[in-house]
Amino acid sequence: MSAAEIVAQLSDGMTLGIGGWGPRRKPMALVREILRSDLKDLTVVAYGGADVGMLCAAGKVRKLVFAFVSLDAIPLEPWFRKARESGALEVLELDEGMFQWGLKAAAFGLPFL
């Protein structure tokens, strides 16, 4: 499937998990396709980097579940920071251990571990 075909199957208000860690190994072709789409009000679950910043800048994110959002050399991704400080998005910030165990529980179909 192409990135456009995948994004065409998504709908407003969905929860999307974005793989990778910080600014590394991100599915940026999919992120760019989401940016070109009319999708909105997304809940994004991610160890964030530029992907989260770009989606926040475009107003695509309603809620972000994260452990951190960083560009490494820039400790706090600027577009995410602006969205958070302005109150444009709801956030659930977890420490890295809780975030990782939450993802593991979800993979097993459990509410918690």
Predicted regions located by residue number:
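Conserved alpha/beta enzyme-core scaffold
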Residues: 1-113
